[in-house]
């Protein structure tokens, strides 16, 4: 089983954030600079919300608002679902699917230690499945030699 801590160990735990007083434009700059789809909104070091590309599309563009004049605090998602380091990938997948979200902040001892995206979950799931396929092929063929590549 793959756990959140395993994913963060591989990808790093650097979570990008902005303050609630940041403009939407500033949040978009951070997302573009780091090639990410969402930023955490931290107020005095505490998680206050999440602002995503989806929020921008639906709450700025479609409503004709100006990104340089709109504060993140006006549009961010406040009821944020989070996971912990000991949660497994299936828990992340279930939350993301049921809540129709793409990013999960990771908390440990009350503080933010990272973010898991739907891309991270898919990548890890594929990797885990490839490993399982290789092991099953070795078992079925009785092969103890070089690993057989999974397609």
Outline where the language-model segments fall.
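The conserved cystathionine-beta-synthase
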Residues: 17-35, 82-100, 107
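A positional/architectural concept
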Residues: 2-48
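Tandem CBS (Bateman) regulatory domains
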Residues: 1-13, 52-82, 88-97, 118-151
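Residue-level signal for alpha-helical context at structural boundaries
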Residues: 22-25, 45, 74-75, 110, ...
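A glycine-centered beta-loop-beta connector
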Residues: 31-34, 39-55, 96, 104-121
């Amino acid at each position: 089983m793959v756990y959140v801590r395993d994913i963060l160990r591989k990808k790093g735990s650097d979570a990008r954030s902005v303050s609630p007083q940041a403009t939407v434009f500033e949040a978009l700059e951070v997302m573009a600079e780091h090639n990410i789809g969402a930023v955490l909104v931290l107020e005095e070091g505490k998680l206050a919300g999440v602002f995503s590309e989806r929020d921008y599309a639906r709450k700025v563009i479609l409503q004709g608002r100006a990104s340089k004049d709109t504060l993140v605090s006006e549009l961010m998602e406040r009821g944020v679902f989070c996971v912990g380091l000991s949660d497994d990938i299936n828990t992340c997948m279930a939350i993301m699917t049921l809540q129709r979200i793409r990013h999960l902040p990771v908390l440990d001892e009350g503080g933010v230690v990272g973010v898991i995206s739907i891309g991270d979950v898919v990548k890890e799931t594929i990797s885990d499945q490839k490993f399982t396929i290789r092991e099953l092929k070795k078992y079925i063929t009785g092969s103890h030699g070089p690993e057989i590549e999974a397609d």
